[in-house]
Amino acid sequence: MKNLIAELLLKLAQKEEESKELVAQVEALEIIVTAMLRNMAQSEQQMLIRQVEGALEGVKPDASVPDHDTELLRQYVKKLLRHPRH
């Protein structure tokens, strides 16, 4: 029983570490996208935003991906492009 609990705690710690790494990656990408958008002329920003949104519209997610997840991704991309971090 103690071994089982120890294994579960170890797996939980590994998952938590993986989660932290993913959060760090997402935050790094947000910072990069924000910096890039800030250094672009307004017309270039709008062109990039239209291209990204157009690319998203053309993507058909796999049937195994829940609609909620797809919508969450679309909303997050829109938020990042239209209202970047300050």
Curated annotation (Swiss-Prot):
Please give the start and end residues of each transmembrane region: none
Identify the Pfam families for this entry: Anti-adapt_IraP
Q: Which UniProt keywords apply?
A: Coiled coil, Cytoplasm, Stress response
A cellular component term from Gene Ontology for this protein is:
cytoplasm
The processes (GO biological process) annotated in the record are: cellular response to starvation
Record bears the keyword Transcription regulation? no
Tell where it localizes. Answer: Cytoplasm
Which first-to-last residue range defines the signal peptide?
none
Q: Main localization of the protein?
A: cytoplasm
Q: Which residues form a coiled coil?
A: 1-47
Q: Which family does it belong to?
A: Belongs to the IraP family.
Known HAMAP family for this protein? Anti_adapt_IraP (MF_01198)
Q: What task does this protein carry out? A: Inhibits RpoS proteolysis by regulating RssB activity, thereby increasing the stability of the sigma stress factor RpoS especially during phosphate and magnesium starvation, but also in stationary phase and during nitrogen starvation. Its effect on RpoS stability is due to its interaction with RssB, which probably blocks the interaction of RssB with RpoS, and the consequent delivery of the RssB-RpoS complex to the ClpXP protein degradation pathway.
Q: How does it assemble?
A: Interacts with RssB.
Can you name this protein?
Answer: Anti-adapter protein IraP
Q: Which gene encodes it?
A: iraP
